[in-house]
Amino acid sequence: MKAGVPWLLHLYQSWNDCVDRLILRSFAKVNIGLKILKRRPDGYHNIHTIFQEVDFHDNIYLALQDDGCSLAVDKSGIPKDGTNSCVVAYKMIKNHFPEIGGISIRMEKMIPHGSGLGGGSSNAATVLKGLNKMYNLGIENKILETISAEIGADVPFFIRGGTQVGDGVGNELGPAELVNGTYLLIIPDILINTKWAYGKIKNHLNCSDQRPNFASFLKEGNLSFKFIQNDFEKIVIPAYPEIGRIKDRLSDMGATFTSLSGSGSTVFGIFDEEADAKSAKSCFQSQHQTVLTLPTNLEI
């Protein structure tokens, strides 16, 4: 569970010790720094990042059904077929546990598609955790992380949550200190294709195997953001200048750190003072979707 922001909103227990229905929060993330390292033999790039979960979320309603997976989404533009990460998550569990029945999934989407906030990966992880609970499968989180990595590189992070160092393709996780502050997310109406971003990155960066250590700059009492950068900004900002302008304005308004999240398009600022973040929000909200939120932490 999350401290202060319950992962599980409602739970209904049935007579046979399975859970009939769940209502779950599916949280977003931001990347505090993202270093692109050398390309791997499998075609993917190794990365180094800090994943920080934030209290901005979709709501996912799960209900048992006899067989199969049905999906309803309240927003257009989200696939509702077998390519949706939630359906993939169900099929993954069904492959490992063929005796389970079906699931009905209804999503209230708040996290925009293609925003760099990990909405699809978070949804998949939430469904995996929900199925584990509803069917009383008893899968340990470490095993669930391994299963989830077959869906997407950052799905394991959403199984674990909180603040994590991400290595490998983002699936190798280790704990990091919570990055406190008030987070202001600015989500412009820009869709950035991740494949496009990675395709461009090889022509703009001298990718190496030299791994930084972002977590060392974020330790309590030694907080320093000046060496933490997102490599995607080098290609995204020239292609989408509005993103650079948002970053500059957030800095001018008092954010201690500003960055693109993932490959975009969300830009976020971390503010020491909530009042400053609220003031900045009022300046952006007529032009872009804005979200004022807080980081979430794992319950000790």
Positions of PLM-derived features:
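Short, basic/glycine-rich phosphate-binding loops at helix/coil junctions
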Residues: 66-74, 79, 127, 149, ...
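Glycine/serine-rich anion-binding loops at beta->alpha junctions
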Residues: 79, 106-135, 153, 255-271
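Residue-level signal for inorganic ion chemistry
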Residues: 32, 60, 86, 120, ...
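ATP-binding N-lobe of GHMP and related small-molecule kinases
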Residues: 5-7, 15-115, 133-142, 169, ...
